[in-house]
Amino acid sequence: LVTPDTIMPPIIQNFNNCTDADVQRIIFRPDGNKMMQINVGGFMCEYDFDRCTGLFSNPVLIFPEQTSNFSRLFWSGTYSPDGNKFYATTQYYFNVDTSYIIQYDLTAANIPLSADTLHNFVWPVQAGAVRLAPDNKLYMACFYDWGFPGFPYPDSVRNMYNENLSVVNYPDSLGAACDFQPFSFYLGGKRTYWGLPNNPDYNLGRSVGSPCDTLTSVAEILTDDLYFSISPNPSNGNFKINYQLPHNKTGALQILDITGKAVYKKDL
């Protein structure tokens, strides 16, 4: 925790909930108030997170850790933008040749039974990391197992599986409506393995109305939590606009040409 004049010591909590499997993952909900913990032993548990104290509480066990007869291996995961769905990718065990991307409905009375397999990947293709991007879509990497040692790829190993990311276009929607499109985002000749960058959300903003939302000044300037970026800039005419409006706020996008003439307008 950080105050205006102090960096606090690390906060350590021992959950003591999964002790056998390696490769633990922690994934925070976009609003920062929940955290999901998964591991390769098939463990999945969600916690409340207090952004003011840095403490976790109220664990909700979704899947216990498996120590034998393994039937699931959670490799990566991410929340939907609305925080009500959780997407997990799995890896395969030695006697299984298939990995998956699975959607869970966190509002369901029985979350394990809400599992919806969006796609299965058969060896030599292996499911990798999945991440929520600033455009509110999910992007997923895959590894193509060409042989030992796996990394790096030889120049000759290029295909649709390792030169594209898969995309969930509408991750707030359940089932087929989320529009999972495998190997649909071309990387311009770059190739994927199991991972994707881990990019912290520095645009989350303050927890409005919370006990730690107390910093004031003599001349306080009230601003909305607005995120907006254009890339590349400058461009050749082809560019991407990413934006995130303040909660429950609308806006308008207007693009002007070099003479100041409006050439595009859209309500957001």
Q: Which role fits each region the language model picked out?
A:
Residues L222-L268:
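C-terminal outer-membrane/trafficking sorting elements
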